[in-house]
Every structure is written in structure tokens, then in C-alpha cells.
Amino acid sequence: MLPDKTALPIITLSQPTAEVGAQVHRLISKCPPLDPNSMYCNLLQSSHFSETAVAAKIGDELVGFVSGYRIPQRPDTLFVWQVAVGEKARGQGLATRMLKAILARPVNQDINRIETTITPNNKASWALFEGLAKKLDTQIGSAVMFDKTRHFADQHETEMLVKVGPFKAVQA
């Protein structure tokens, strides 16, 4: 019997460490329309905020990364900063899998809401969070958070605040 050439590679998820910060920086640069951050920022996301981030790898290659943090005034809310999925791993539901992996960690069992910002024309991100809301059996809403003119001085598209929740704890 011939090997199945359509078999998908195994993608492993883990809590990131500072050692993946440079790989995160490279991955995000290859995932437009994501805004690039400094490598230092990516190092902090991978270390200080590792409980609310996830790294996805095929072997030693980083193919996905989600960064987020708990909103200080509302620690039951995860703010998702960025979701990056490399070309090699697209179309496999990896973004949803990564978000659910963060929520399923014992340390995050009290998170019952997600917030993020999405530009109006980022269809992939809208589909991701609309699909996640369905999977979590909850509602989704949006409103302007940062306006193109008022906040970005016409240098960036308007960012819509997207709210998902409330939802029940996600099990591993």
C-alpha cells in the first residue's frame, strides 16, 4: 500500500517560552494583515503572557501563534491580541484549536469572555470569531473601538471591538 500523501502533518500546541519569540516575529511578518510588533514585544508575549498564549509547531517549525492577555479590570475576559497561522497550517481549523487550548488550561478556567479587535474587511478573522462563538454556544457582538480618523489619524483602518461570551469553561 502506498503512503497517504494527503495526510496532514501533526501540529503540536504548547505554552510558549521566550525561546520562540524570534520565530513569532518571523511568523507574524508572513501573516498580513497582522500588524507587526517589535521582536521585544513578541518575546514578552511568549514569556510574561505565556498563560494566555499558545505556540503551534510542526516539528521544530512554528506554524501558529495566538497572543492574548487578561484585561486587568475584568480578569474573566481574555483579550486576543493576535492570531497568526502560517501558510503551511491554514485550512485545518488551527486558529480555533489554539484559542480553545488557551481556554482549556486549568489556570484559565475562569475566563468566560473573549474580546479582540478586527478591521471591517478582515473576513478570515470575522469568520474565526463568529465560528468560535457558535462552538462555545454563545453570542458575539461588535462596536467601534479605535476609529480610523479619531484614533489612527487616518493611518490605519478602524478596529472593531468584538465580544464573544459569556460561555462555560472549556474542557481540554
Curated annotation (Swiss-Prot):
E.C. number: 2.3.1.178
Coiled-coil ranges (or none): none
Keyword field: Acyltransferase, Transferase
InterPro entries reported for this sequence: Acyl_CoA_acyltransferase (IPR016181), Ectoine_EctA (IPR012772), GNAT_dom (IPR000182)
Pfam families per UniProt: Acetyltransf_1
GO biological process: ectoine biosynthetic process
GO molecular function, one term: diaminobutyrate acetyltransferase activity
PROSITE patterns registered for this protein in UniProt: GNAT
Swiss-Prot/TrEMBL catalytic activity: L-2,4-diaminobutanoate + acetyl-CoA = (2S)-4-acetamido-2-aminobutanoate + CoA + H(+)
Thermal dependence: Optimum temperature is 20 degrees Celsius.
Location of the N-acetyltransferase domain: 11-165
pH profile of the protein: Optimum pH is 9.5.
Pathway: Amine and polyamine biosynthesis; ectoine biosynthesis; L-ectoine from L-aspartate 4-semialdehyde: step 2/3
Recorded superkingdom: Bacteria
Regulation: Inhibited by zinc and cadmium.
Cell wall biogenesis/degradation found in the keyword field: no
Functional summary from the UniProt entry: Catalyzes the acetylation of L-2,4-diaminobutyrate (DABA) to gamma-N-acetyl-alpha,gamma-diaminobutyric acid (ADABA) with acetyl coenzyme A.
Subunit annotation: Homodimer.
Family note: Belongs to the acetyltransferase family. EctA subfamily.
UniProt-recorded name of the protein: L-2,4-diaminobutyric acid acetyltransferase
